[in-house]
Amino acid sequence: MISPISFLSSLLCLTYLTSALPILPKREVVTRVHTASTTNVVTDFYSTTTEVVIAPTVEFLISDSVTFTTTLIPQGVNPTAEPTTTITKVLLKKAEMSTSSQPTSTLQPSTIPQSTSSFQAESTLQAVSTQQTAMSVSAGTSEDVQQLATTSTSISSSPSPTTTSTSTQNIVSGVGEANVEGNTQSQHHSYQAAATSTLNQQTSTSIASQESTESTNTPTSSSTSSSTSSSTSSSTSSSTSSSTSSSTSSSTSSSTSSTQETAATTSEGSSSSSAAITSSPKAIAYSPYNDDGSCKSADAVSSDLTLIKSKGISKIRVYGTDCNSFETVQPAAVKLGIKINQGLYITSSGVDSIDDSVTTLIQYGQTNGWDVFDFITVGNEAINNGWCSVSDLISKISSVKSKLSEAGYSGQITTSEPPVSFENNPDLCKKSDIDFVGINPHAYFDTSASAETAGTFVKGQVELIQGVCGTSNVFVTETGYPSSGIQNGGNIPSTANQITAVQNILNEMDLDVTILSTYNDYWKAPGDYGIEQSFGVIEYFP
């Protein structure tokens, strides 16, 4: 039997040993069991309910310069919601023309240089849904009759007609297409403008003009096709997009619109020959071609230049040496005391395509003298058209200048390009042998411009290129505004807007520009924008 003393002694001994040895943690074995019930499945359903709010529809009814607005609020529509759809009913004018000689096709000789170019400035992305019924465009006007298809009201106006020979053209202005009746397409040029300002177009915009009112969109790409039908597509949907580059500020805007056109027919206006512009430019572009593309006779050319001289214009720009122009244009110009900006037109064949023209020019100068020439222009927008490289053009300018100098010509030489060509290729003005910089700025192709701002646009382009090229010696070798064609941004072609634009250009540039052109050039195809034939302005000068 253990005595109490022995038990206590043993307990104390164990306590001592326990305190002396380390205490190890208890080992635990944890088993993780993944369970999935096979008999009790619970599924959580998550749902989102979106409230659909129908906004009112705003309807614009445009008649000439008057716009009627109606807000449509059918049953179930929230009258306080923002409208998202605009229906614009455009009531355009109907015009007919009777002429003594109107060609049935648009002809363009392969040797005839195009004197008009076009470019794109800040691009606009637009989705267009257009419903059109029997819409066509024809050139020339003898009487304007505005018919309101949706009402019983009719309005007519009868300006004095000017008889012209034209080619029929059908233009879908809403979607930027041109359906042209004829077999030949013009060399429509597209280039980018170094615009100094931008325009943000808002959704559901309608613009009314004096001649024709259209709710249209900026075409950034378009197609040209032959057509003999007077009506165009119905319920046509088109979406176009384009990107442009410029070292100046640029803007891209998008807009959507829905346009409904009913029984609309428009025409290019040609009103009375009474002066509407208060002053004349120092120079005007002239082409010695008949409306069908054939060459004018010496008598016809002499009559044209006599008219130009009577308007107080002392210089003309001629784009090429074809049509036997050295025997028709030059003699008439010498007789009338008109100076010529003689062009050497570079074609798609490259810079060597002007070699024969250079030879002909030298032969004329050595025989008749050089006094009739104001200056010589080597190429017109050849860089922009992609018909030659900058280095090739620079070399050709040097070669031509050397040959002309050896032949006795001591005048100036230049080339003519849209402003963006010099902006993208400053060597063309900084490292070439041109005596001044020639630019072709056109406000129509800048969607942020308009007829009212055409003058400031042209002046801004001159100042821009002065900075790019490091010289103040920049001259406007071609500019103008169309009287007919497709709306491009803030630019609405019409006779009234053409007069406004040209007057503003002359005011801003102190008359020192070359205006395109003497007559409407019906020998050209209308081009993608439907404007190429309608730059003629001689009748509006005093």
UniProtKB/Swiss-Prot annotation:
Polar residues bias: where? 138-149, 182-208
Stated name of the protein:
Probable family 17 glucosidase SCW11
Give the enzyme's EC designation. 3.2.1.-
This chain's source organism reads Saccharomyces cerevisiae (strain ATCC 204508 / S288c)
Xref: PROSITE patterns: GLYCOSYL_HYDROL_F17
Tell me the keywords, alphabetical order.
Cell wall, Cell wall biogenesis/degradation, Glycosidase, Hydrolase, Secreted, Signal
Region Disordered, as annotated, extends over 98-119, 138-169, 182-276
Q: Which GO terms describe its cellular component?
A: cell periphery; cell surface; extracellular region; fungal-type cell wall
Active site positions: E478
Compartment(s): Secreted, Cell wall
Q: What lineage does the source organism belong to?
A: Eukaryota, Fungi, Dikarya, Ascomycota, Saccharomycotina
Q: Which residues form the signal peptide?
A: 1-20
What GO terms are given for molecular function?
glucan endo-1,3-beta-D-glucosidase activity
